[in-house]
Amino acid sequence: MKYLNLLILCLIVNLSFGQTSNWQKWQPIEKSHSLRIKTTKAEYYSLDLKGLKNQISNAPEAKDRDVIAPILSLPMPGGKMIDFNVISSSALAPGLASKYSEIKSYIIKAINDERVQGRIDVTYQGFHAMIQKGADLVFIDPALDKNTINYIVYKKTDLVRTNNFACLVNDESEKESLNFDSNDIRVSDNNFRTYRIAISCTGEYAQFHGGTKEMVVSAMNTTINRVNFVYEHDFAVRFEIVDKNDTLIYLNPSTDPYDNNDVGTQLDENQNQCDEKIGSANYDIGHIFSTGGGGLAGYAVVCKNNRKAGGGTGSGSPVNDAFDIDYVAHEIGHQMSGSHTQNNNCNRDDSASFEPGSASTIMGYAGICAPDVQQHSDAYFHGHNILEMGNYIVNGTGNSCPSKTILPGTKPVINTTSGNHIIPKLTPFEMEASATSEYPLLYWWDQYDNEVAEVQPPLPSNKLGPLFRSYDAVPSGIRTFPKIEYIVNNSLNTWESLSAVARDINFVVTVREDITDGARHSQAFDKLTVDANKGPFLVNNPNDKNVT
């Protein structure tokens, strides 16, 4: 009750969940000074957790397509409720799931719009949700420590960055060559891959999460459930926390084998601990969580004995999207052969620096290396990471250890005309692609020029490097450069700069199936040339922002 006393109830609203009863209530509550997650804007609710658990207890697995899924209503920013179908999708291996039977994870899909989808989990720490709703990523998390009643609902864009983070990469000499040519990109196939992940932790991480194995396994489950949301979408890959993983959980900072603040020494010790406690043959990738030390990971180490546990993530506040996506998904990305994509000089990888500034996708440095495109990473990978990580997963060492199941149908086929398109200087333009598939498709265009840019944010005079930031996938294969609202309003977008000089601008388009449980993708390249002796092409009349 002491946690409830921190809150002042300001409004009670009865809302029904599901289609047949109103037995579950959410109650908006006033903001508290002791909130676990800091935002600039949010809404607050209380939840009948027991009722919610009962409501979704019979959720079918994805393979049981003939079983009717339960319906769950969840609050969105602005107060709207959305109904979702709920499908069971455990992030724990069967033995671990049986031992910690209160920990459950699910896929959710909106009934009226299957593009609104995400992940939820119910654990000893309460309820968590991560929902992709168009361009918005929405979260529902416990508002207070050790409290499963009160919750915060917020958009990722409203999350306040509370600490700095540094990421290092061990031994990039392990990069495996991309064995394809530009006309035949085979970095996605018809397999859904499951990697067994062993996660250890320092005593400090355990104490942050309540100091019991039940609470720590719960926290690890929430993180991996959210990481799976991204990796299943972009690579048809999921991670399953191994049986006996609780033997890697250390509750006492004084007696654990790790230095909480030195992620470098953690990796060597973590390799020893995972091999000793789990057995090298019983896991495919290992990782350690801490509350300090930043992030460090071996490059392309998944499936490699004596190296595969070489990944770690530390944060003073190891919760919510900043930890799960910005940090953990990023460090695991290195272990899966993902490179830094930011063009800034903070740990830049010259072979992969395709994004302006600090970048905005997972393998960039969003919010931690000025000038920043934005404060947090968007929950997807840049086209180059899709290329190199997909190659490692499908054609490289990363294909040697996961279990595989065959996906129905075939991957998308892109129907696009590539070539050298010529445009006048300082002239907006569109890139267009189309593809065929038996499933709905999503498209995203990324610039594919990795030279070190002369100036960041990019200027029209830049002759090298990226001019255009990445944006998340949309149902249309057309992207306008810059975004159409900037063109209509005669305004500038800091991170989308038209060129005023003669140069080539290269692009990669990624097309992905719009499904939650194992999406495949295809990619193609295109290029345009800027003619500095012509243009700019202008619309002089009418020149009114109200004209469309």
Task: Identify the meaning behind each predicted range.
Residues 18-37, 149-297:
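Fold-level signature of zinc-dependent metallopeptidase catalytic domains
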Residues 19-141, 265-268:
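N-terminal prosegments of processed precursors
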Residues 240, 444-501:
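Exoplasmic/lumenal beta-rich domain surfaces
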Residues 242-265, 303-379, 451-455:
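The catalytic-center signature of Zn2+-dependent metalloproteases
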Residues 393-413, 527-536:
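Proline/serine/threonine-rich low-complexity linkers at boundaries of modular beta-sandwich domains
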Residues 422-435, 548:
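A short beta-strand segment in extracellular, disulfide-stabilized domains
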Residues 436-446:
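Solvent-exposed loop segments of extracellular immunoglobulin-like
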Residues 511-519:
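Short, solvent-exposed loop/turn segments at the edges of extracellular beta-sandwich modules
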